[in-house]
Swiss-Prot record:
InterPro entries: ATP_synth_F0_asu, ATP_synth_F0_asu_AS, ATP_synth_F0_asu_bact/mt, F0_ATP_A_sf. This is ATP synthase subunit a. The chain crosses the membrane at residues 20-40, 81-101, 113-133, 140-160, 176-196, 202-222, 223-243. GO terms for cellular component: mitochondrial inner membrane; proton-transporting ATP synthase complex.
Amino acid sequence: MKSLFEQFEIDLYCIIITRFFDVSITTITVYLGLLMVIVIGMYKVSLYKATLIGNNNWQHIGEMIYEFVVDLILEQVGKPGILFFPFIMSLFLFVLTLNVMGLIPLSFTVTGQLLVTFTLAITIMIGITIWGFRIHGIKFLNIFVPSGIEPWLLPLLVFIEIMSYVLRPISLAVRLFANMLAGHLLIHIIGVAAIYLMQFYFIGILPWICVIAFMFLELGIAFLQAYVFVLLTLIYIANIINLH
């Protein structure tokens, strides 16, 4: 690659602009389409094989992910959180699959785009805020009022709580974006060094070993970042349900 950041450049394939929306097809659009095909295809294969031959590896993987997400919801939110299972399951698979897809050589890392992660984070926060007003009404605003505080401190703490709430989507988005960006840049740098050092025979093997090791590390980070993203989302949901 000519540039270190070339792998994060967004290509425009087709311009489609309607009266109200710009629905042009870009690299992000293509990879989101692939994401849907992969996730739906994986579960279709799992169900198809389960019908023909009973238990299979695909089914076991699906069940492991299902149980992992359910346990996470019960741990962070409790039984009321099961209502959010379809959303949390979809969110986890969305982030995890995009993270893993970005590890494929010469591919595009969708979660390495701040625009994508911020759009996802702000949509989540708007959605759970609307839900908070729906279940609590005007009492939802009590989430910004700490209990047991001296009256003269209340305005300052309410301001801090509001700012903390407003900044949540930014921290959620930047955390995922920064980790994926840094990891892929590191692999790129080590890969370029490995190609350069190949001319030194056995010395050139060492960087390639590092590349492979970092690829496995990035695979773990891909899962970890999906876990953290979903975990923080559940914590925010729990805060809204319990108003604290």
